[in-house]
Amino acid sequence: MREYIDAAAFKEMMLCADAALSDNIQIINDLNVFPVPDGDTGTNMSLTMNSAAAELRKKSFDAIDAAASCVASALLRGARGNSGVILSLLFRGISRRLKGIETAGAAEFAGALSDGVDAAYKAVMKPAEGTILTVSRLAAAAAVEAANAGASLESALECAIRAGD
């Protein structure tokens, strides 16, 4: 069982996230009914994450903060639509929390997720529930609660996944 996320693990997580978004574009598009049922959330999130994955594939990192910073920058540059911008904001907050950190355990990573949510909510003029913001908030809160209860990194991430499902 992994007790911390290092740069290589973070990179692999992001590449897996890119693949998962690509594989589920239509499902996410079909969920997109608010605030405008334009059916492009999955497409925009996937295209945005593609830009981060492309950057990650070109580089190796010694610490999680460098990998997170790379992801945040690439997402911002490649953001498509509102959901892509929100995704980039989430990772801007995550990256800021991980600054100066080589590896992240359950508490550090859960805190980074929480900071990502805070950054996204603060940047959106009128945050609407029932969106990517809500899913992110629920996932981060579950990770923080689990980490605060002494859960392992793996357990905290599993709690986040279940809460966001």
Segments predicted by a language model, with ranges:
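N-terminal loops that bind phosphate or other acidic moieties
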Residues: 1-165
